[in-house]
């Protein structure tokens, strides 16, 4: 075997090549630290693999913020997340990094973000209308096209990382901890994204992937929303995940994909893949979800969930799909009738990847003794007596 066939992004290929080195060389980035005394933790919102997340108050202006306290991790990874957030700051529907603080004693870094008044997706997605789904998908695409145009792949698109303030119809794409700069020809770690949203390229260990990875993950989100099946591809491990995909997209196109890129499939797949025909999207429609499905929704989905990453729609192409015609028309009408306002800071619940939603906070008791609050205390952020008390 001569090794895999190289691949380059179809769009925004050389963005970082044309930028000055300091734009993408995050290892050399010098972090400017703010004052941790400006923030008081109020309650814990959740935890993830790499951090603990709190609602907090900025005592200088009394505004709610979200504080993401990073667990011990390589300095390089922290710098990457910070540099990416700084590069993307002000972009459409990108969570705003407000401050970076560190306790002088523990050296624990924490990222301070705008607050998003998020509704848990498991509750929210069950209530969304056809138009709502189109609207929010379009809002995610604005964020993705922007970050891709800035030479950045998110690499962890999933419902947990999309904060929606439904009352104000505001959306933010959060948790840029796995995001990376795209350099054509570079081989990347395939251990990114969450299992149910991993693209086939990750599952077959193809490392020369690009922005199109995010478009697969978005397709998985769309499928789960329109078919009311969460998650849509429900694998029990990374191998089974590809099997679940093959049972829908068929094995024939999978083998065409691995042949095209000269990918060597892990021998473990020999016993579990089998042979499967490509299923029609219509077979997933039933009485409970038919009000969310339309021919244009299925056509759009079909153009996202493609094995071949080069065949998927780009974020910009996706925004021009007929699925969004009504949304585009409405937004054009609104912007012509109202003064175009800037991006309003929004509010958040689970502010990062893999956060398990925390139940309605109980009065302080058990929370105060938690190692998280202890860690936060050592961070030099004073915890008010009412931390964790119900608002």
Swiss-Prot record:
The modification Phosphothreonine is found at residues 344, 360. InterPro entries: CK2_alpha, Kinase-like_dom_sf, Prot_kinase_dom, Protein_kinase_ATP_BS, Ser/Thr_kinase_AS. Phosphorylated at Thr-344, Thr-360, Ser-362 and Ser-370 by CDK1 in prophase and metaphase and dephosphorylated during anaphase. Phosphorylation does not directly affect casein kinase 2 activity, but may contribute to its regulation by forming binding sites for interacting proteins and/or targeting it to different compartments. Constitutively active protein kinase whose activity is not directly affected by phosphorylation. Seems to be regulated by level of expression and localization. The modification Phosphoserine is found at residues 362, 370. Keywords: Apoptosis, ATP-binding, Biological rhythms, Cell cycle, Kinase, Nucleotide-binding, Nucleus, Phosphoprotein, Serine/threonine-protein kinase, Transcription, Transcription regulation, Transferase, Wnt signaling pathway. One of its GO terms (cellular component) is cytosol. This is Casein kinase II subunit alpha. It comes from Mus musculus. The gene is Csnk2a1.
